[in-house]
């Protein structure tokens, strides 16, 4: 599938769930996209396209839907996969940071040994909304003395301004709505 068509493909395979997880939020459900092997493969291919030349050592997936997309991206790039999880979900010593969400606040953690100093890290998540989660991921990567090289998202909710909280040159979204 040509890169110009990937946004249309993503748009055709997500559904809006109004008032979930709380009133006033329109949840972007990616399960229809994941259920179609050719569509899921095209999405993964599009996410790895800019990083295929050995520029990534680790791929971060942010709990929970980020895991689903980031793991195959890591596999295709020959990179390690690093889960960033909600507070209290990782069994070993962690680094942590708190941040604001579109619908509340949260804390994410990563194992203290998830990165080596200087690791080049790609962050992959399903949705860029306010940018709080992605900014928190960048903070944890920095705390670990690694270097973020990209932020890739399936969907960007442009009206929420998340891109403005992040290094704009690092942000790539397959679909901006």
From Swiss-Prot:
Chief site of localization: cytoplasm
Catalytic activity, as annotated: AMP + diphosphate = 5-phospho-alpha-D-ribose 1-diphosphate + adenine
Record key words, sorted: Cytoplasm, Glycosyltransferase, Purine salvage, Transferase
Compartment annotation: Cytoplasm
Residues spanning the signal sequence: none
GO cellular component annotations of the record: cytoplasm
Glycosyltransferase among keywords: yes
A biological process from GO: AMP salvage
PROSITE patterns: PUR_PYR_PR_TRANSFER
Biological role: Catalyzes a salvage reaction resulting in the formation of AMP, that is energically less costly than de novo synthesis.
The protein's name in its UniProt record: Adenine phosphoribosyltransferase
Organism from which the protein derives: Acidothermus cellulolyticus (strain ATCC 43068 / DSM 8971 / 11B)
Gene coding for it: apt
